[in-house]
Amino acid sequence: MAAALQRIEQLSSRVVRVLGCNPGPMTLQGTNTYLVGTGSRRILIDTGEPSVPEYISCLKQALVEFDTAIQEILVTHWHSDHSGGIVDICKNINNDTTYCIKKLRRNPQREEIIGNGEQQFIYIENGDVVKTEGATLRVLYTPGHTDDHMALLLEEENAIFSGDCILGEGTTIFEDLYDYMNSLNNLLKIKANIIYPGHGPVIHNAEAKILEYISHRNNREEQIISLFRDNFEKSFTVTELRTMIYKDVPENLHKMAEHNLLLHLRKLEKDGKIFYTTTPVKKWKAVL
């Protein structure tokens, strides 16, 4: 069972967590949104889901409690549990205030619309710095979970806001395992002290958590490589591989297992370790 989190909690002298009030299997206790800084105007990281009045109420309460206002909004990635609350915040905080809303571009680029289109994202890039009183945030491009995912390094604390790249509990999902593993390794190089995740409790041993994530994926990958190594002359469909790799997975999870397996296969293909043929059906085989 996920650990209970307070709806509003001061985590450090410059970080306040406001829970998104949207608990669920994918969001754990809810989306973590953060007010960052020490002054009368602070940066809001992520916005929760649309149409959650409890969250707007909590955010208003936090702004009053800490005698501050929103300077601007940073969105870690496009998923609706992180970007969906933008319109509600703009409408209900300070009477239709138009905030500066920043994120990374989708890759490949595509049009992104906020609400009815009255507001637009301001696109930032890897390495950009966003400042407010008491806080300096450096943008870290961390694709894998999504193509536009960013983490943020809070330089004053050597802490990472990880979005959904790393969660406080359990593991995350991803679109591209090759990019995701590169992102984990890049975050590891920072040698951060703390991780403020997009869901779940604060992670106080950042290095150990990142290594745990890397190990989890490497173990599955090694299992797949071993199967190809032991059957070097053979080629396999994804379904055939699933029956050997995920032997104990119930039938209702077969599609998800095959999806995860396919992400591993695509990474191994990028690594030059396997390839596939499509005649008569798509099959994967070890590289000679």
Curated annotation (Swiss-Prot):
List where in the cell it is found: Mitochondrion matrix
Q: Which residues carry this modification: N6-succinyllysine?
A: K273
For binding Zn(2+) 2, which residues are annotated in this chain's numbering?
D81, H82, E118, D164, H199
Q: Which Pfam families match?
A: BLACT_WH (PF17778), Lactamase_B (PF00753)
Residue numbers carrying N6-acetyllysine: K102, K282
SUPFAM superfamilies per UniProt:
Metallo-hydrolase/oxidoreductase
Which major enzyme category is it?
A: hydrolase
Residues that coordinate or bind Zn(2+) 1: H77, H79, E118, H145, D164
Is S-adenosyl-L-methionine tagged as a keyword?
no
What is the predominant subcellular site recorded for this chain?
A: mitochondrion
Where does it sit, as one GO cellular component term? mitochondrial matrix
Tell me the cofactor note: Binds 2 Zn(2+) ions per subunit.
Spell out which residues are annotated as carrying Phosphoserine: S235
GO MF annotation list: RNA endonuclease activity; single-stranded RNA binding; zinc ion binding
CC cofactor:
Zn(2+)
Q: Which domain of life, per UniProt?
A: Eukaryota
Disulphide bond pairs: none
- Please provide the record's keywords in A-Z order: Acetylation, Endonuclease, Hydrolase, Metal-binding, Mitochondrion, Nuclease, Phosphoprotein, RNA-binding, Zinc
Q: Which InterPro entries match?
A: LACTB2-like_MBL-fold, LACTB2_WH, Metallo-B-lactamas, RibonucZ/Hydroxyglut_hydro, Sec-metab_biosynth-thioest, WH-like_DNA-bd_sf
Under the subunit heading, UniProt states: Monomer.
Q: Note the PANTHER family from the entry.
A: ENDORIBONUCLEASE LACTB2
Q: What is the documented function of this protein?
A: Endoribonuclease; cleaves preferentially 3' to purine-pyrimidine dinucleotide motifs in single-stranded RNA. The cleavage product contains a free 3' -OH group. Has no activity with double-stranded RNA or DNA. Required for normal mitochondrial function and cell viability.
What family does this belong to?
A: Belongs to the metallo-beta-lactamase superfamily. Glyoxalase II family.
Name under which the protein is recorded: Endoribonuclease LACTB2
